[in-house]
Amino acid sequence: MSTTLLRTIQLNQFSLLGTSLLRRRRSNNFSVRSCGSQTTTTHEAKQSSPTRVAPKNHKSNQLDEILRDYEAVIGIETHVQLSTLTKAFCSCSNNYGSYPNTSICPVCMGLPGALPVLNSKVVEFGVRLGLALNCDLSLKSKFDRKQYFYPDLPKGYQISQFDIPIASGGYVDVDIPLEFGGGHRRFGITRVHMEEDAGKLLHSDTGDYSQVDLNRAGVPLLEIVSEPDMRSGIEAAEYACEMQRIARYLGVSNGNMQEGSLRCDVNISIRPIGQAEFGTKVEIKNLNAFSAISRAIDFEISRQALLYNQGKADQIVTETRLWEEGAQKTVTMRKKEGLADYRYFPEPDLPEVILTQEYVDSIRASLPELPEAKRRRYEAMGLGMQDVLFLANDVSVAEYFDAVIGKGAEVKLAANWIMSDIAAYLKNEKLSINDIKLTPQELAELIAAIKDGTISGKIGKEILFELLAKGGTVKGMIKAKDLVQITDPAEIEKMVIQVVSENPKQLEQYRSGKTKLQGYFAGQVMKMSKGKANPGLLNKILLEKLNAKD
């Protein structure tokens, strides 16, 4: 029957599978969430009177008192979808957003007789990520079959790694932003293993039917399993952010959560302060943003702590819960499966993965500077932590900044220009730094022109926005528009005398105590000079004339 079902999908590219397995009662329906240009699915299970521990964005004083008695223990499973050209075990293209069921073949559809062939790029990316996370690599690893049934899993099993992952025993260092208390954290990495993704179910708004898209089936993933080292929603969210940064720095994934390229499942339990034994672990899914990770964890901590405090700890069960963004709460999805339910056994159609030390060393030598090393380097340059976190957050911004200072620009000035005016321009125009016309060389030239007094800061900003939009050279624009700053004291003094003599009323008011009128006079001189008068020299001469005794 399954063969017939899957052949139907191949013939009809977006076939509706009208089987009872894909139908859902209204009490156990599937909701559809729009995420960017893609429709993704979330499961909403039957839930009777879910507990709402705290109103949105508010915790009562009573709950705060309860929370002081408990400690959260949090771990995260992060699925990183790899940016390979083809899928993990077949030659189908790995293109996000393709028309449904157009990137499929007998291998990723699980048809009889079709055999998988490992994409070597998946192994390379696994080694790169394992090294970046300070893991020990397995020079000999293998694939296993993780068996379970779900309509988007055509083979009836997932090719994964069970007891011998490609990497294990690592750690990652994370800097917590200053607004959340700051500080440095180190979180352990249990393992990194290779596996394939499942397909995707798209459900009707009514829940009466579901559609299957197998384009994603067989797309390569790396799953990163952390140690249960996190203790708050903020720590967990920052850990997930760091996973995204590392994946992007390495070039193994675009890490776009809205496309499903980075997916996080959170495991959380709480225990009374001082207790060594872990509490009952609950998994949370449907976390589509880093802020959602933090909010979902904070809610779940509150929910479990309240149950503990009420003597209802037995109601905290091992289960999978969903985060409902609209309601700002978690709800039960299903009872959590154990390892035995998956009936792992070695994948018979794939050989062992054998790595040589020479291969590992060559990949290690090709690793770029990673976010943690970049942050420490920027810190050593004298930048504040806020600047460090901003610049190192995006690999493209970091590369641009490095290129600017590589052209001789002063570190702090370059950071200020990128973080203020350029960042504002990018936000307003909805662009990335790779889209702008201003090259690092020209930004360095602009900073130098302001610093050496060739142009004023005000003129510099005007030039900046034109260069961002249209490109060009700083020297060429200064020459073409006659923007060279006036630094001749005699010329500035002449303009000051003229402005003061033309405004006797304002001069009298200034000398009567309204000293704020200095700005008025300075503005008039700037207007006369078309913004080219040196501000420092102008203010010095202006004060002399305004305070002179006639």
Curated annotation (Swiss-Prot):
Keyword entries, A-Z: ATP-binding, Chloroplast, Ligase, Mitochondrion, Nucleotide-binding, Plastid, Protein biosynthesis
Gene Ontology CC terms, in alphabetical order: chloroplast; chloroplast stroma; glutamyl-tRNA(Gln) amidotransferase complex; mitochondrion
Compartment annotation: Mitochondrion; Plastid, Chloroplast
Known catalytic reactions: L-glutamyl-tRNA(Gln) + L-glutamine + ATP + H2O = L-glutaminyl-tRNA(Gln) + L-glutamate + ADP + phosphate + H(+)
Keyword Chloroplast set for record: yes
Superkingdom, natural source: Eukaryota
Stored InterPro entries: Asn/Gln-tRNA_amidoTrfase_suB/E (IPR017959), Asn/Gln-tRNA_Trfase_suB/E_cat (IPR006075), Asn/Gln_amidotransferase (IPR018027), Asn/Gln_tRNA_amidoTrase-B-like (IPR003789), GatB (IPR004413), GatB_Yqey_C_2 (IPR023168), Gln-tRNA_amidoTrfase_suB_CS (IPR017958), Gln_synth/guanido_kin_cat_dom (IPR014746)
GO MF annotation terms: ATP binding; glutaminyl-tRNA synthase (glutamine-hydrolyzing) activity
Main location: mitochondrion
Pfam families documented for this protein: GatB_N, GatB_Yqey
Entries under PROSITE patterns matching the protein: GATB
Residue spans of biased composition, Polar residues class: 35-51
SMART domains, per the entry: GatB_Yqey
GO-annotated biological processes: glutaminyl-tRNAGln biosynthesis via transamidation; mitochondrial translation; oxoacid metabolic process
Region (Disordered): 32-60
Other noteworthy facts: This protein may be expected to contain an N-terminal transit peptide but none has been predicted.
Function of the molecule: Allows the formation of correctly charged Gln-tRNA(Gln) through the transamidation of misacylated Glu-tRNA(Gln) in chloroplasts and mitochondria. The reaction takes place in the presence of glutamine and ATP through an activated gamma-phospho-Glu-tRNA(Gln).
Subunit (UniProt): Subunit of the heterotrimeric GatCAB amidotransferase (AdT) complex, composed of A, B and C subunits.
Entry's family note: Belongs to the GatB/GatE family. GatB subfamily.
Identification of the protein by name: Glutamyl-tRNA(Gln) amidotransferase subunit B, chloroplastic/mitochondrial
Species per Swiss-Prot/TrEMBL record: Arabidopsis thaliana
